[in-house]
Amino acid sequence: MNKLLLVAAGGAVGSVARYLVGVGAMRVMGPGWPYGTFTVNVVGGFLMGCLASWLAHRGNTSSETWRVMLGVGVLGGFTTFSSFSLETALMIQKRAYGQAFTYSAASVLLAIAALFAGLLVARKVFA
């Protein structure tokens, strides 16, 4: 039960943060591209890399608590691959194939690259 509360609390924080990034991106960049979703997927990948490295460095029993709250809860609520999938499908339905390909390829590749960058940064910081 305690883990469920950690996931719920973390998920609430992550979801609110995701919403605020989306609102901010829409205000700054406009509706022409899903900038908010793109941003949270890349930033979320980087933060997950940092978290994974930090937890591996800690290596104690409290690491599971942090993993559940931050990794599953906060970052699970923050990153939005379900929204990403919907937005890509909508682009395809509109026959915007080039935009759909560019958006999906850039999101996946940059999120993975950002995760590796997060691992490298955190290894240097926590080593």
From Swiss-Prot:
UniProt protein name: Fluoride-specific ion channel FluC
GO biological process, one term: cellular detoxification of fluoride
Keyword ATP-binding: no
Name of the gene: fluC
Summary of activators and inhibitors of this protein: Na(+) is not transported, but it plays an essential structural role and its presence is essential for fluoride channel function.
Annotated binding of Na(+), by residue: G76, T79
Superkingdom, natural source: Bacteria
Pfam family, one: CRCB
A cellular component term, taken from the record's GO annotations: plasma membrane
UniProt KW keywords: Cell inner membrane, Cell membrane, Ion channel, Ion transport, Membrane, Metal-binding, Sodium, Transmembrane, Transmembrane helix, Transport
Family, similarity comment: Belongs to the fluoride channel Fluc/FEX (TC 1.A.43) family.
Reactions catalysed, as given in the entry: fluoride(in) = fluoride(out)
Gene Ontology terms for molecular function: fluoride channel activity; metal ion binding
Record localization: Cell inner membrane
Main subcellular location of this protein, as a coarse class: membrane
Function, in words: Fluoride-specific ion channel. Important for reducing fluoride concentration in the cell, thus reducing its toxicity.
Transmembrane parts of this sequence: 4-24, 36-56, 72-92, 101-121
Membrane topology: Multi-pass membrane protein
